[in-house]
Amino acid sequence: MLQRSRLLWLAVFITLWVSSDAQDDAKEEENTFDLLQISNINRKTIGAKLFRGPDPAIPAYRFIRFDHIPPFKPEKLKKIVKLIRQNEGFILSATLRQDRQSRGTILALEGPGISERQFEIISNGRANTLDLIYWVDGFQNVISLEDVDLADSQWKNLTVQVTGENYNLYVGCDLIDSFILEEPFYEQLKAENSRMYVAKGSIRENHFRGLLQNIHLIFDTSIEDVLRKKGCQRSQSTEVNTINESTEILHLSPAVTTEYVGEKTEKKAEFCDRSCEELGTMFTELTGLRIVVNNLADNLQKVSEENQIMWELIGPNKTLKNQSVCWQDGRVFADSESWIVDSCTKCTCQDSKIVCHQITCPPVSCADPSFIEGECCPVCSHSDDSEEGWSPWSDWTKCSVTCGSGTQMRGRSCDVTRSACTGPHIQTRMCSFKKCDHRIRQDGGWSHWSPWSSCSVTCGVGNITRIRLCNSPIPQMGGKNCVGNGRETEKCEKAPCPVNGQWGPWSPWSACTVTCGGGIRERSRLCNSPEPQYGGKPCVGDTKQHDMCNKRDCPIDGCLSNPCFPGAECNSYPDGSWSCGPCPAGFLGNGTVCEDLDECIAVSDVCFKVNQVHRCVNTNPGFHCLPCPPRYKGSQPYGVGLEVAKTEKQVCEPENPCKDKTHSCHKSAECIYLGHFSDPMYKCECRTGYAGDGRICGEDSDLDGWPNNNLVCAANATYHCVKDNCPLLPNSGQEDFDKDGKGDACDEDDDNDGVEDDKDNCPLLFNPRQFDYDKDEVGDRCDNCPYVHNPAQIDTDNNGEGDSCAVDIDGDDIFNERDNCPYVYNTDQSDTDGDGVGDQCDNCPLMHNPDQTDADNDLVGDQCDNNEDIDEDGHQNNQDNCPYIPNANQADHDKDGKGDACDPDDDNDGIPDDRDNCRLRYNPEQEDSDGDGRGDICKDDFDDDNVPDIFDVCPENNAISETDFRKFQMVPLDPKGTAQIDPNWVIRHQGKELVQTANSDPGIAVGYDEFSSVDFSGTFYVNTDRDDDYAGFVFGYQSSSRFYVLMWKQVTQTYWEDKPTRAYGYSGVSLKVVNSTTGTGEHLRNALWHTGNTPGQVRTLWHDPKNIGWKDYTAYRWHLIHRPKTGLIKVLVYEGKQVMVDSGPIYDTTFAGGRLGLFVFSQEMVYFSDLKYECRDA
């Protein structure tokens, strides 16, 4: 029985222990909130990227799309706000790695309105503070903890305590800074129609930049317990001697009461303070106790048996036979009778057995109790002294604050061996110092303007003044002064002041009334400097003055016989002689005899010339110019004499409707001047973000040149006016195989055969049965070699038969095994160097090199590649048709071996280029029927490529007529790299759109057209949310070691291969010049990834200081301007209709032109759409 009792007590003890532990766990779970979990943030959340943090079992997140961050669940938010009010605050625990010197919101509560915020916690890396911002009665309050060192790109474990009056920050186990709150802002928090977020700021600049992990809100737990759970150890002595700035009371034994003068606080939750070792010792002691109890039970049983034997020996009293009585000390006691053996033992007779027990005394509450004779228990004498047992009070502690209201404490101890010590052991009182300076840094603000002052004059024009002061508010704590002037002055007008009249200057003397013999001359003046006004006095004096003139005697006049040429001045002398002055304007001679002057010959450039032909007409006398030629505008001067001819020359300017604003382009279109020789002289192109024929433009969301809605364009419109069949995905070719109105780019089943494109082995041909004989993942119905494995489907001669199964790949009627250029059409099979490779496809046609190696990918074999290029135009000297003049395009229209750039007669028609009205077409007759300066033979097609100039992307180069990347050279920049695969390019829109589908090593798809000055534009779009790396384009490509590249990174990242050099890639647009000494390989690969300069590899010309990365599923449009002659490079990037990136003018003359191409590095599903390049060599 005793054994069962012991086991029962042990089971009760274990049950209470486990139950207490479970309650603690439930309480912790109820009062601790995982903010990422209640926000439903996981790996599927858009814009949330998974990373590995310090705790490998829990994911860390970086947010790049803050508009997709979900708020807390409403029911959880209501509970959190309720707990904040109950606990008078909260504790925030988080593990984070914040980007260096960034400013980011960690936690924010916004609402009930759309733009209202109730409070937020912001880590300000620029100011190195942790800011608590809250709003009370519409006013913003900012409290900053300083020198926190959070935004340094290092992992930090922080604990933020906002409880009562405390605002404290712990990093790890260290208290960094603290502040006393003056307002209980948490009492005004509202959950209704509100939203709480992590990482999301009120504006774009306040979003959190970095990684977050293990972010929790904790309630009903002291800051000491939170830190203890994080492994922070605090010694007992330290805890006892620490006085908290809050009004919490130290927890002592329940036997001692505490008196507190200040505000009451709720009792904090207690936790088990026994270690596992202590509990083990307790079980050992319980086992020993069980042994002792068993021994006592055995001894008691022996005593009972001995008593029974004694009872039988003595025997009962004869008179008490058949009665239940008890014997003790010779006395007989009846059944149920009780008696006191001594003062502290009481016995009772029960069924002839004596049962005794000791009297239990209640505890006394005094130090000196007294005993009354005959009584077992001591008693206290009554005393009214409440100080009994207490030590004297200690001195008051220092005030808890240095300004404002605080508290002081004092204590005393109790001698518990002498007294129960009624009353408190700690007392608290208020203390007050000078008022705290709660000022914060604030910028100055202007007061209202004062009234205008009175006018500074009583008549006429004066000034009035008003002032304002920089005192609303006054700048303080380093705040900025007010911007602007504190004084304004304006004119004021009163009645005009009287103006007295003043004489003006005398006029010249008039001609004398006679030339000799005495005459009269006069002069006059006016009272107009100024005239008398507004009651002023008139001028005093005469208005006219007379004088005698020509008083000499009259001579004999020799000019009366008109001896001089008409118009020449005749001078007569007193002796009767005469002389003639110079010939009149327009004549040459001695004054007596004059001849006509031919101004057209004397001033050869007096009139406008067309093709060096003079358009001046000489008259007698004088000259005049013919009207400006057709499509020119300007003056038609005429006159007489050299002075007029020299000063009034004819200027004829080509008509330019774009400049004159006489064009008919849409307001959202750009007028592009084509030249006065073109008909029409201009064309209209819709601006970025719009599409149409230029006369009419509509919205174009995906920037692929097709409008969102149908446009009513002109009847002869040839450009995009039809509604975009994929309005949200760039597809400039508008391919629609099944004609269902939905473009192939966004149609999940292009051929309507019931098999989605990503699973269809013939996505553009109806084949529901999906037969594939050769297992090359190309269906038999669309396989150009159905019985030969050829997944690439290359068909060089475009005859429908793939190269893998064709006996004549290039279609030149020479079988492959006998064709020395199997992939190039060459019927003559010429092979000058006899290396077995035909001249048409030989990269060294004059030097034996059967292996055809080309290490630098410049289309010149290594055997004959000397890389000597004095003019830096990408063509080595012995292959350059102008070795000393840069001409990357190598244009040579008369095929004489001398490039146009250094050929004085490009068409070899005997007319020098500067006088040839068709510089690129043979026309020795120079016929020009309309006299506009452009020869008839090249009127609308200057380069004779059968493409009208208005549609020709290079109207002065017959080798290039349209944008076309259908044929390109694939250049792997890390050909031996094993980290990823090579790029995979898909061609669309007749080479005006390319899609790169693979997550690849760095590579270029470079076209074969070559350019000097060029404009290059295209639409950039990433059709996936996977990865965040580089894409862009190249220009001035001369080899895989020499080119310019514009590359765009989504997020900042260190390259995963840190050999041979460590590479840091920053988000944003970078413009780089590659001039590698090693060529393709891992050195160039890491240098391209790195944002900065790598000696001997890459030099960064410009990086966008805003570090804006591209976004998934967003269309961008780039525009490049490159002028190698001056070194000008300029790049614009549009997002929608707005310019997002503008490099401004950058100058670099490393390379004088080259080829264009597209670039990718570790980024898949990149769309390059609506590509367009135009020559700008003119």
UniProtKB/Swiss-Prot annotation:
Residues 387-437, 443-498, 500-555 form the TSP type-1 domain. Pfam families: EGF_3, TSP_1, TSP_3, TSP_C, VWC. This is Thrombospondin-2. Gene3D superfamilies: 2.60.120.200, 6.20.200.20, Laminin (2.10.25.10), Thrombospondin type-1 (TSP1) repeat (2.20.100.10), TSP type-3 repeat (4.10.1080.10). GO terms for cellular component: collagen-containing extracellular matrix; extracellular region. Homotrimer; disulfide-linked. Can bind to fibrinogen, fibronectin, laminin and type V collagen. Residues 966-1178 form the TSP C-terminal domain. Residues 737-760, 852-941 are annotated as: Disordered. Disulfide bonds join C399-C431, C403-C436, C414-C421, C455-C492, C459-C497, C470-C482, C512-C549, C516-C554, C527-C539, C559-C570, C564-C580, C583-C594, C600-C616, C607-C625, C628-C652, C658-C671, C665-C684, C686-C697, C713-C721, C726-C746, C762-C782, C785-C805, C821-C841, C844-C864, C882-C902, C918-C938, C954-C1175.
